[in-house]
Amino acid sequence: MLNNPALLERVDGHALFANAAAMKAAGITAATKDPSGGRLERAADGSPTGVFVDNAMALMERVVPAPTKQQLRSQIIGAIKEANRWGLTGVHDAGVPRAIIDIYEEIARDGAYDLRNYVMVANSDSAINYYLGRGPQNDLYDGRLWIRSIKIVADGALGSRGAALLEPYADDAKNNGLVTVPAGRVHDVAVRALKAGFQVNVHAIGDRANRTVLNEFEQALKEVPVPDHRFRIEHAQIIHPDDLPRFAELGVIPSMQASHQTSDMYWAVNRIGPTRVLGAYAWRTLLNSGVIPNGSDFPVEQVNPLISFHSAVSRQDANNWPAGGWYAEQRMTREEALKSMTLWPAYAAFMEKESGSLEPGKFADFVILDQDIMQIPAELILKTNVVATYLGGKQVYQRPVQ
């Protein structure tokens, strides 16, 4: 293995680990500079250790052999079936390149796309130009694909200390994180999107990234005042108290993933300190914005949506720790948690007239569980199984007889 080029990607997609053979293949040396928005971890002598964070990952990704179209198609169909197995009828798919969207459309034309996918176009000029020129695409292929959104990544992740913070990390005093997009990019794309009827969704985890995105959204909305824009900040994990009310004021939707809180809570206070953590994973406070779509962020977290449901209502891990919940005052009620995974994501995707609830005129998308998650004790939620999944009235998953 030591002689073969090898790359491992961190689960959150914000760091790569390369061995010496891989770095040699990519031409990485001590003289290789950190790119804007990226970082190479280095030894004391300045030589790269093999850890590439955020935009530095591209230095290694350029030498990775590309999968074939058939491999991608097979993986996509497999992922759809896996999503159905866990009770998913729809997803919001962030940062998708045009080549992958083309495969989605091909599978949908073949009648094999058993999922409703709200696609966020990747942040590349060529893809943005193409899809803005094409215009918003709603309800394609019997409601399988919706293409009317653009995804931008504004900073890194908390786990790899790449989330952009206003003040240094509590456990890394010389590091404020990484800004992964040029200044003004969010504003410029937002202006174009508003004029074309598109939504903009921006990944922002740190308080500096969240503030910057809110500022650039605010300026764009002054220039192109569209009332029902439904711009989103994806994750919105760490927010300065001064910025919490700005979501509601600007009509920006905080799109969060409850399972991040229960994954991060073991080290979050050490990472950002006891004061900043009060503005982290602050769902109850952000509910003043009206809606909080709640997803899983798979494959960063597990695909099972009940993990996020359980996290939202308990703020505990699968072992019911900590007792009473982590900063339990920020919990959601079960009704709020259910809406955060049904009605509110539909609204956040301009799909509330077609999806999000079982009503006349809407898609007959639903899941049958073997327990009532609205009534059982919280500690039993994660022991719930999916019995069957239906999309448009068609059964797309049936649990095998045990």
Model-based region annotation:
Residues 1-133, 148, 152-209, 222-225, ...:
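Divalent metal-binding segments
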Residues 52-53, 163, 297, 368, ...:
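Short clusters of small/polar residues that mark proteolytic maturation junctions
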Residues 127-130, 264-268, 304, 399-401:
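Short, charged, surface-exposed secondary-structure boundary motifs
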Residues 138-141:
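Accessory "access/gating" subregions that flank catalytic or transport cores
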Residues 144-162, 251-262:
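Non-cysteine beta-strand/loop elements that form the S-adenosyl-L-methionine
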Residues 158-160, 245, 378-380, 400-402:
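Short conserved micro-motifs at the rims of enzyme active sites and ligand-binding pockets
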Residues 190-201, 205-231, 235-236, 241-245, ...:
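His/Asp/Glu-enriched, well-ordered alpha-helical/loop segment
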